[in-house]
């Protein structure tokens, strides 16, 4: 599980949903008949919320007011299991509140309650002390700037310098026209309008897009220059060439919070793949999910997977998995099998295996491998479907499909802390045990087997 530190402006989003069919007798304005009220985490907290939805561990740093809204906000974060030890109380300001009025799924007005003053000296010190204390244990840092007073120039540059000192990935969602504030960041995520305003350059074609991204890299020393282009997707610079990554969204209902989704998904994907094109494709898919919903919506890994051609981010090649595990300090558990017609016995076995460590990797026999082992009538379920079903189990972290008759190549490459096999190997040699620190034999739950299910189906349909 990746640890991400999110620093920025915390915003409470409040929604009034209703219908409007009458005009007020007091003034020529519509009357809203409220049918529903809802609250959600906004600003940097929405970035944190998106990261949680994608499976990260999140530490949030920002400021709320000493008011009821601030207390509710912190409680909502704790319910989402966000670490709030970096959320500071400012007695001189209110908690930033944005109220949106929605009529027939259309936002008609937004009312903002906020104070944008810079942080006082004590709060600045406490914020930077918290960042300095936490930064070494983080995998990545996100600065979510909504220009509400938390991320001024000095604080932003201090945090970026700290991140670079500790070789941490740091991404910034920028606000305002002075991009020197974000210089030396790993990546920033301006949209087209924001970048046009900052560079005084109309982004009306590939030539100017390329020029803008080159300015970000050469003038502001942004390692991975990028711009989000709404319905046109994302454009980025790679080896001084413009690369376009088209959008995947089919229907757009509400773009609220889409930028938060993009920076959250980019961060996690970059940490996993270290490939900007793959990260942009993943972020586009995540954005496509949230703009198809109303409000500050979230995208799950399963929803993103459905958009990415029925693939799943847990299903990886051995090369990609080794890349992810390169700096891993957690206990890795490995098991393997066919998992043809997934049943309760399989799920129970995998849950027990996961309990032995932190990361559970499943080596999955390919269709060709199963045919060689079990005959031409197997598998019943194809490898893509078997892999997707396994990926849907919360106890499974990664799946690698292998073509060989045994997983010895996988085990040798992965060198897991614990190798798990079924108890039927009690008097047999466990293949690959020499490459694992420990081997554990685990019994399957009695009364469940793929063969028994197949026989039951055959009997039922022969009657």
UniProtKB/Swiss-Prot annotation:
The keyword Nucleotide-binding applies. One of its GO terms (molecular function) is heptose-1-phosphate adenylyltransferase activity. Pfam families: CTP_transf_like, PfkB. Pathway: Nucleotide-sugar biosynthesis; ADP-L-glycero-beta-D-manno-heptose biosynthesis; ADP-L-glycero-beta-D-manno-heptose from D-glycero-beta-D-manno-heptose 7-phosphate: step 1/4; Nucleotide-sugar biosynthesis; ADP-L-glycero-beta-D-manno-heptose biosynthesis; ADP-L-glycero-beta-D-manno-heptose from D-glycero-beta-D-manno-heptose 7-phosphate: step 3/4. The active site is at 260. HAMAP family: HldE. NCBIfam families: cyt_tran_rel, rfaE_dom_I, rfaE_dom_II. This is Bifunctional protein HldE. The gene is hldE.
């Amino acid at each position: 599980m990746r640890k991400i530190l999110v620093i920025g402006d915390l915003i409470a989003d409040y929604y009034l949903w209703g219908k409007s069919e009458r005009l007020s007798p007091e003034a020529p304005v519509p009357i809203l008949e409220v049918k529903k009220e809802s609250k959600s985490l906004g600003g940097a907290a929405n970035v944190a919320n998106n990261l949680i939805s994608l499976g990260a561990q999140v530490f949030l740093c920002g400021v709320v007011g000493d008011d009821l809204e601030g207390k509710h906000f912190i409680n909502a974060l704790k319910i989402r299991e966000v670490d709030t030890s970096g959320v500071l109380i400012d007695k001189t300001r209110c908690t930033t509140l944005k109220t949106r009025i929605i009529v027939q799924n259309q936002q008609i007005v937004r009312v903002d309650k906020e104070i944008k003053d810079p942080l006082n000296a004590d709060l600045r010190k406490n914020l930077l002390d918290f960042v300095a204390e936490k930064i070494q244990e983080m995998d990545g840092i996100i600065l979510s700037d909504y220009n509400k007073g938390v991320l001024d120039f000095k604080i932003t540059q201090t945090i970026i310098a700290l991140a670079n000192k500790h070789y941490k990935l740091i991404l910034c969602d920028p606000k305002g026209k002075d991009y020197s504030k974000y210089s030396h960041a790993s990546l920033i995520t301006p949209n087209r309008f924001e970048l046009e305003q900052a560079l005084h350059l109309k982004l009306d074609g590939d030539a100017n897009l390329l020029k803008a991204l080159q300015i970000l890299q050469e003038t502001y020393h942004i390692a991975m220059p990028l711009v989000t282009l709404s319905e046109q997707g994302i454009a980025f610079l790679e080896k001084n060439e413009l690369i376009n990554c088209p959008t995947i969204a089919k229907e757009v209902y509400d773009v609220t919070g889409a930028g938060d989704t993009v920076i959250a998904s980019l961060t996690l994907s970059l940490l996993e793949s270290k490939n900007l094109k793959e990260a942009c494709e993943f972020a586009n898919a995540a954005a496509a999910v949230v703009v198809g919903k109303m409000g500050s919506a979230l995208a799950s890994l399963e929803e993103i997977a459905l958009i990415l051609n029925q693939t799943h981010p847990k299903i990886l090649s051995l090369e990609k998995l080794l890349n992810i595990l390169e700096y891993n300090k957690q206990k890795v558990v490995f098991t393997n099998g066919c998992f043809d017609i997934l049943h309760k016995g399989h799920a129970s076995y995998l849950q027990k295996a996961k309990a032995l460590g932190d990361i559970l990797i499943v080596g999955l026999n390919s269709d060709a491998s199963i045919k060689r082992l079990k005959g031409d009538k197997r598998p019943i379920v194809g490898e893509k479907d078997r892999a997707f079903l396994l990926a849907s189990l919360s106890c499974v972290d990664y799946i690698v499909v292998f073509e060989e008759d045994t997983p010895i190549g996988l085990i040798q490459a992965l060198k897991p802390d614990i190798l798990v096999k079924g108890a039927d190997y009690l008097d047999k040699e466990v293949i690959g045990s020499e490459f694992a620190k420990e081997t554990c034999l685990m019994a399957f739950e009695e009364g469940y087997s793929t063969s028994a299910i197949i026989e039951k189906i055959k009997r039922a349909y022969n009657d």
